[in-house]
Amino acid sequence: MFGIGFQELLVVLVLVLLVFGANKLPEIGGGLGRAIRNFKRAASEPDEIDVTPTDKKDKNDDKQA
C-alpha cells in the first residue's frame, strides 16, 4: 500500500522503542488510538448549524439612532 515492507516496519518499531522506551509505548498507543477514534467521530458527525433566530429589526433601529 505505502511501499513499506516488513524490514522497514521493524526498523521503525525499533527506533520508536529506543526513543520512547518500553514503558511509554502503551501510553503512546492509547493516545494514538484516542486521536484516531476522535477523528473518525468528528468526520462522521454532521456539522452543527446555528439556527438561533436574530431580530433584524432591532439591529436596524440601533443603526438609525
From Swiss-Prot:
<feature type="transmembrane region" description="Helical">
    <location>
        <begin position="1"/>
        <end position="21"/>
    </location>
</feature>
<keyword id="KW-0813">Transport</keyword>
<dbReference type="InterPro" id="IPR003369">
    <property type="entry name" value="TatA/B/E"/>
</dbReference>
<comment type="similarity">
    <text>Belongs to the TatA/E family.</text>
</comment>
<comment type="subunit">
    <text>The Tat system comprises two distinct complexes: a TatABC complex, containing multiple copies of TatA, TatB and TatC subunits, and a separate TatA complex, containing only TatA subunits. Substrates initially bind to the TatABC complex, which probably triggers association of the separate TatA complex to form the active translocon.</text>
</comment>
<comment type="function">
    <text>Part of the twin-arginine translocation (Tat) system that transports large folded proteins containing a characteristic twin-arginine motif in their signal peptide across membranes. TatA could form the protein-conducting channel of the Tat system.</text>
</comment>
<keyword id="KW-0472">Membrane</keyword>
<protein>
    <recommendedName>
        <fullName>Sec-independent protein translocase protein TatA</fullName>
    </recommendedName>
</protein>
<dbReference type="GO" id="GO:0008320">
    <property type="term" value="F:protein transmembrane transporter activity"/>
</dbReference>
<dbReference type="GO" id="GO:0043953">
    <property type="term" value="P:protein transport by the Tat complex"/>
</dbReference>
<keyword id="KW-1133">Transmembrane helix</keyword>
<keyword id="KW-0997">Cell inner membrane</keyword>
<keyword id="KW-0653">Protein transport</keyword>
<dbReference type="GO" id="GO:0033281">
    <property type="term" value="C:TAT protein transport complex"/>
</dbReference>
<keyword id="KW-0811">Translocation</keyword>
<dbReference type="InterPro" id="IPR006312">
    <property type="entry name" value="TatA/E"/>
</dbReference>
<dbReference type="Pfam" id="PF02416">
    <property type="entry name" value="TatA_B_E"/>
</dbReference>
<keyword id="KW-0812">Transmembrane</keyword>
<keyword id="KW-1003">Cell membrane</keyword>
